[in-house]
C-alpha cells in the first residue's frame, strides 16, 4: 500500500497527518508513505525528523482581496499541480490525503485529475479556502466540527474528529509536573499561547501574577520562545512562589495535558482536539489573527457545550482573568461539569476513524 499525504504551513495541518500515518502503520506496517509539502512550512522540519520521505513544491496562498499577487499565486498553483502530477506518477500512490494548508491544493487537485482516490481533512469549524475548492474534486471530506458540514456536499462528509486526539489519550503523566518544578496531585493551570507564544495572552497573565502568587493552585506558564527572556526579566522582582513555573516551551505536551486541571490557551483545532479527548476544561482566548476568525468559531463550539469559557482578545483588557480562573477551580461542581462536557465532545478514536474512511475510498 502506498499513501501520499500533503498538508502544511502550521502544526495544525501537519500533526494530524502524522497521527494518521502512525495509526495506519499499526494496521499496515508494510505501507509506504510520501509527504508532499513546501520547504518553507513547518512540515519541512517536522516530517523530515520523523524519517518520512519528503518532496516539496512551491505554492503561496490567495489574498482575500483583489491583488496582482493572486495572479502569481495562480501561476504557482498551475506549476505546483504539474510538479505534483509528476511526483504522483513516480510514486504511484493508492490514495492521496490532504490535511489543509495551501500546499495540499495543487497536490490533491493533481491526484483527482489522475483518478487517484482522494480525501481531505478539515480540522476547523470554518472551512479553509483550499479545502472548499478541493471538495469539488475529492471522494470524501473528513470533518471535526458539525458546524462546518454546510460548507461541503453532504454525501462526501464523514465525521472523524482530529486524529491528533488519539495521541494524547492514555499517555503516562507520572513525573510530568515535577519536571517543571511543580508538585503532582495539586490543582494546576497550564497557560500557553502556541509554540511561539501569544503577546495578548502573555500580557494578561503577567498582569495577574501578583494575585496568583497568593493562590494555592499551581501555574505552569509557557511564554513561547520569542517572549521568554523579556518576560523573565520583567518577573524577576515579583519573587514568585515555587507553585508558579515559567517556561519558554513544553516539549512533552501530551504528558502535561494529562496532568493539569485547567488550560488557558488559544483555540487552534489541534489544541481543542487534545483537550476534549482528555476532558480538560479550558479558558480559550482565540487568536484574532487567523483566517475567517476560525479560532473563535472553534472556541464557541466548546463554549456552547459548556466545555470552555471564551474570552476574546479584545475583551481581555476588561476581563478579570484571575476571577475567571477562580470561578472554575473553587467550584468543584462547575469544574466537574466542564470536564464531563469536554470529554463528551472528545473523539479519542479519531485516528482510527480517519484510517477507516481512507481505506473505504480505496475499495
Swiss-Prot record:
Q: Which reaction does it catalyse?
A: di-trans,octa-cis-undecaprenyl diphospho-N-acetyl-alpha-D-muramoyl-L-alanyl-D-glutamyl-meso-2,6-diaminopimeloyl-D-alanyl-D-alanine + UDP-N-acetyl-alpha-D-glucosamine = di-trans,octa-cis-undecaprenyl diphospho-[N-acetyl-alpha-D-glucosaminyl-(1->4)]-N-acetyl-alpha-D-muramoyl-L-alanyl-D-glutamyl-meso-2,6-diaminopimeloyl-D-alanyl-D-alanine + UDP + H(+)
Q: Which UniProt keywords apply?
A: Cell cycle, Cell division, Cell membrane, Cell shape, Cell wall biogenesis/degradation, Glycosyltransferase, Membrane, Peptidoglycan synthesis, Transferase
Uppermost EC category: transferase
One GO biological-process annotation of the entry reads: regulation of cell shape
Q: In which pathway does it act?
A: Cell wall biogenesis; peptidoglycan biosynthesis
In which compartments does the protein localize? Cell membrane
Q: Which residues bind UDP-N-acetyl-alpha-D-glucosamine?
A: 10-12, 124, 195, 250, 295
Q: Which Pfam families match?
A: Glyco_tran_28_C, Glyco_transf_28
Looking at the keywords, is Lipid biosynthesis present?
Answer: no
Query: NCBIfam families annotated for this entry?
Result: murG
Function of the protein? Cell wall formation. Catalyzes the transfer of a GlcNAc subunit on undecaprenyl-pyrophosphoryl-MurNAc-pentapeptide (lipid intermediate I) to form undecaprenyl-pyrophosphoryl-MurNAc-(pentapeptide)GlcNAc (lipid intermediate II).
The UniProt family comment states:
Belongs to the glycosyltransferase 28 family. MurG subfamily.
Tell me which PANTHER family the record gives: GLYCOSYLTRANSFERASE (PTHR21015:SF22), UDP-N-ACETYLGLUCOSAMINE--N-ACETYLMURAMYL-(PENTAPEPTIDE) PYROPHOSPHORYL-UNDECAPRENOL N-ACETYLGLUCOSAMINE TRANSFERASE 1 (PTHR21015)
The protein in question is named UDP-N-acetylglucosamine--N-acetylmuramyl-(pentapeptide) pyrophosphoryl-undecaprenol N-acetylglucosamine transferase
